[in-house]
């Protein structure tokens, strides 16, 4: 049985239906995706992918990876594994096991800079149908911390590698899973809102609204309807010192634009996890002050969260990024704050 990937409605978590053949089975896309001319979808954001209900004993996917730099996380009935993709087009056995009803989830483990991944089709000996669309939805706009950069590294002294990145082990994915919520993760390693850690614009000021990093087509963000929005930016902006009023102006503008698009969403501005000293203090002040200003002006659904992380085993991953325990601690902090403000 062949299921072609056709994006219906371009809405987060909406099932994909074949508009030409009524008997074609469906899958549900996770995160942002772009339609490929001739069939299929293109993914590039970390943690994006698909989920399906398979009645059968196997599932195979035809995938095109741009450079062979990406890994996928695979979850079948709660059991997790990972595969490294090859450059070019190849067929991958997602699972092969006992006949029955299986829930299959496939997501990008690696970052946006690893190039695009095209999902052309999936095949099964049985049927493929979309899983149910969760009512709870989260949008996270972030950087390397939210995409799980180096999270599985031994300590802060290891150098980053694709093998040590795992978006599913980063706090956005952990929180979304804890609330059974869909996650729309928009993150770029090394990118800031006002300025990037290295390199020239564009920044997340532009990227936050795009379908993919390499596809400037505006994402129809008004169709996503997240109840919770996390802005996890600032570390790269303040990495080389205080960027000044340009950052605070862009931060306020981002919140205001998100508020227009999502009038009832709770917006959380988070900070912490990687910087220290004056850089940390400047970033914390800029973000908390901006949020306090908006709250005073009448937006009661905007909140500031500070991640405080004590030194402990697995505090650090590669290149001084948060490790496994740090990501889990950030997830618990965010869960507590969401519980306080959101009726989930």
Task: State where each predicted segment sits.
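Structural recognition of the beta-strand scaffold that forms the well-ordered cores
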Residues: 137-141, 146, 183-187, 227-232, ...
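Surface-exposed acidic, glycine-flexible loop patches that form ligand/cofactor-binding
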Residues: 128-131, 214-225, 256-262, 296, ...
